[in-house]
Amino acid sequence: MAEHSAPALEIDPKYGPFDKHTPMMQQYLKLKSAHPHTLVFYRMGDFYELFFEDAEKAARLLDITLTSRGTTNGQPIRMAGVPFHAVEQYLAKLVKLGESVAICEQIGDPATTKGPVERKVVRVVTPGTLTDAALLSDKVNNHLLAIAQIPGKRGAAPLVGLAWLNLVGGELRLMECSAEQLDRELERIRPAEVLADDATLNAVAFDVARTRLPDWHFDVEAGARRLREQLGVASLVAFGCETLTAALAAAGALLNYAAATQGQSLRHVIGLTVEHESEFIGLDTATRRNLELTETLRGQESPTLFSLLDTCATSMGSRLLRHWLHHPLRDRAVPQARQQAIEVLLAGDWQSLRGTLRTLSDVERITGRLALLSARPRDLSSLRDTLARLPEVRDQLPQSDDAQLLGDLHAALAIPEDAHALLQRAVMAEPAAMVRDGGVIARGYDADLDELRDISENCGQFLVDLEARERERTGIANLRVEYNRVHGFYIEVTNGQAAKVPDDYRRRQTLKNAERYITPELKAFEDKALSAQDRALSREKYLYEDLLQKLLPHLPVLKRIAAALAQADVLATLAERAHALSWSRPALTDAPGIELIRARHPVVEQQVEQFVANDCVLQETRKLLLITGPNMGGKSTFMRQTALVVLLAYVGAFVPADAATIGPIDRIFTRIGAADDLAGGRSTFMVEMTEAAAILHRATPNSLVLMDEIGRGTSTFDGLALAWAIARHLLSHNRSHTLFATHYFELTQLPQEFAQAANVHLSAVEHGDGIVFLHAVQEGPASQSYGLQVAQLAGVPQPVIRAARKRLAWLEQHSADTGATPQLDLFALPSDPSDDDAAEAAAPAAPSALAEALDGIDPDSMTPRDALDALYRLKALSDASA
């Protein structure tokens, strides 16, 4: 991703002597010096122009034309441009590439300015500070995050402070964590842009757009002061962050940077949430990836848990649902309140509620743009129409003494009468897209604007009336009153009627066959009419800006309404999903353990015709399940579905199971699948061991641990020894709820040593030379792994399968004779004479006469007689070979 540094304040020497440049280029270079690592979009008329190296870079990234025009300092001016009315599409492309763009507008009046029109950078568009609807994903929050590190006291590890902001939503959050936890938190938050000093950014592995700031931006005292100013308080004690020094340092840098990019204060950032690791069920990077919450293992958006659940009626709901899935809560009270609300919704008319919600606009983002004074006319009309429908939403929210959450939402959705009335009076029913086009402010809102519009709109009728009066007054029947852009309004009289022209006519233009005149009355009207449209647009722009200011005091209530609508949408969506997918309400209890009855994998179930539901019981006397069975038998699916049911329960959703009783959970760990990290210089086995080590260090008795085929990637004895030791450690030290899938059948002896371990297996049956997977979890260990049958299904050549069968038979016989599994040298010759056939089978063999004859037969082209003859020939060849 692109990196940016803090602005410098001096002209780059590469541009040569400053006084050798033209006045306009001097203006540009001053602006560019404040944004040296940012593309500068310099407004010139209907285009944003880029110059010098910015032009070259933009031409390459945007595939636009690079040209030269004029000279400055004796050199051609390299330039490229984009039309201002289509700038959003170019900004979107640049931001996706990790670039930042400074938008430089004309703020002076060309009519009264000598030299270059005054310009200034009005905002800086960076990956983390997007506010335009065209640049934002509807269903993903866009976060700007700052990281600050404070040295630990007395040799302790440094404190890492995080502050992150959803700029358009106005949500500010803080937390502190350890350095080793940083990447996990970045994976959870997934910011679009990170701010930090050099040393901190160099230690960040997360792939993200980065902006480097000097160390002094991350000052604790300055950060605390900036945060108090932002929140309008004298103390931060009430927010619980006064002692979070590293987080305060990060917050100060974050708020200053965000305000600088917008060129104004952040009026809508009026609250603060302090997060603690203990609030949420811990999900590390591997777990989020393996459970495919919002992205598949291949990096696709579907099929995932989010894509299955997201039938939300609003974009606000989709964003909140995504947040909930990544933040399951440890405290049972909140998910239980959500589940109770879902139950009440299911008993009512949730379909009508969802229908109404679909008609609403994105109040959260409109409110953010309103706070930044960048809301467009249709934002305001959408906001007005949404506020008008709040009573309908409230009526459709069922009220119950058993669902306090729904009551809270009902109260939060009271219509703000003053704001709604103001929008109704001020904004047209269907306003123009941009205020510069006019047609935004409603008639009757401002008398001066109405008068100017009347002049402009009644211009045609005035000219018709004037023409009729002048014909009658002068007796010139073919007199015409007209207008053109060069000469304005005029009265045209043919040369043959010139003698009838009154004295008050003043000649304006002479043509070959006619004269054009102006009268005092027409001149007065011309002055008024020609300026009326410009004055109306100017007046409308002023009124619109004033309207935005008048709406600012309503920001807190609008933010509350946005949050309530999003939550109502998610709850109604989860109710719809529970109904459509036949999910049930889980029971969250104090007693440790997990008991799932006929549980299903929520996503896989939708991808197959028939899904086999399974039970899963983990309790104090049954902490670890050793899962054996064939590849493709469903072990990984069984493990993942258990984790997803637990996660959904603590999100507050219903779950894909007939019944679920789940005790306290603090973390979910997964060690599933095989993948290397070539960029990081780590093999598949190293990645596996690194993830296993993290689990062994961090898992607690309330953690859910999924371990899939641990120990592969090394020799048989090494892998088996590691798998045995890891399973024992999880039982004796971590005591976590553990699902441990393995192909090491020796591990099935573990329950003999630990009473809290139990064997289960995924069943399969052989059918002829093939295998049928039953996908049913049954008690006890599997009888075999069916590896050869799976290899055959995969299309492994038959000679290889035959050789493997013989080798397997010898290995099993050797194991039975010695009571041990041999540590094999795969490159050694067979040590048993009976295995010569296996070695022979593995080598290429000359085709037999019978095989050659079979290869030469084309059954589709044979007559019945030909087929009978061929059968006799094959029988003869078979007898001869025998």
Swiss-Prot record:
Keywords: ATP-binding, DNA damage, DNA repair, DNA-binding, Nucleotide-binding. One of its GO terms (biological process) is mismatch repair. GO terms for cellular component: cytosol. ATP binds at residues 629-636. The keyword Transit peptide does not apply. InterPro entries: DNA_mismatch_repair_MutS, DNA_mismatch_repair_MutS-lik_N, DNA_mismatch_repair_MutS/MSH, DNA_mismatch_repair_MutS_C, DNA_mismatch_repair_MutS_clamp, DNA_mismatch_repair_MutS_core, DNA_mismatch_repair_MutS_N, DNA_mismatch_repair_MutS_sf. GO terms for molecular function: ATP binding; ATP-dependent DNA damage sensor activity; damaged DNA binding; mismatched DNA binding. Gene3D superfamilies: 1.10.1420.10, 6.10.140.430, DNA repair protein MutS, domain I (3.40.1170.10), MutS, connector domain (3.30.420.110), P-loop containing nucleotide triphosphate hydrolases (3.40.50.300). Pfam families: MutS_I, MutS_II, MutS_III, MutS_IV, MutS_V. Belongs to the DNA mismatch repair MutS family. This protein is involved in the repair of mismatches in DNA. It is possible that it carries out the mismatch recognition step. This protein has a weak ATPase activity. This is DNA mismatch repair protein MutS. It comes from Ralstonia nicotianae (strain ATCC BAA-1114 / GMI1000) (Ralstonia solanacearum). The gene is mutS.
